[in-house]
UniProtKB/Swiss-Prot annotation:
Gene Ontology terms, MF aspect: structural constituent of ribosome
InterPro entries: Ribosomal_bL28, Ribosomal_bL28/bL31-like_sf, Ribosomal_bL28_bact-type, Ribosomal_bL28_sf
Name listed for the protein in its UniProt record: Large ribosomal subunit protein bL28
GO cellular component: ribonucleoprotein complex; ribosome
Gene field: rpmB
Name of a matching Pfam family: Ribosomal_L28
Domain of life, source organism: Bacteria
Family indicated by similarity: Belongs to the bacterial ribosomal protein bL28 family.
GO biological process: translation
Ribosomal protein recorded as keyword: yes
Keywords carried by this UniProt record: Ribonucleoprotein, Ribosomal protein
SUPFAM superfamilies: L28p-like
Amino acid sequence: MSKVCLLTGKRPIYGNTVSHANNHVRTRFEPNLHTKRIWIEEEKRFVKVKLSAKAMTIIAKTGTATLAKLLK
């Protein structure tokens, strides 16, 4: 699986790490992804998905209905 959040679409971005001496080094910034088993009440089953920390907050606030719409 790729390093992409299913709900928010966050993916790695590229940029520079800049030191105190202003040296620029190219780097890849990874999203804060976690693999979770989420119970989808509408389908009565568990779904294993990769979610960012922000997506887990969205699911906690709005419920799994938003995730169920994406999986259909």
